[in-house]
Amino acid sequence: MRQCMDADNLHRRLKKIIGQVQAIDRMVDEDVPCEDVLSQINAAKSALNKCGQVVLEGHIQHCVRDGIQHGDADKTIESFTKAVERFSNMG
């Protein structure tokens, strides 16, 4: 699986998200206004969604392409459909 995505890019994004979530946790302790906390939650959610896009793009560029060219196209399409369904349920 690692070869089908830009692992360095993904790790960098995930570390940023971890920092955002830790900041949100501190905001709760510091009694920051709810609107500001919600804004930061939305930012972290958007960043996590972008991580999903990175994984899905890698899946398309590598796994799907390879599966269609060298494997079973029907199985590849089924796998791709499942990946898209899982990603679309992240919202």
Residues covered by each model-derived region:
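Solvent-exposed interaction patches of small proteins and small membrane subunits
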Residues: M1-G91
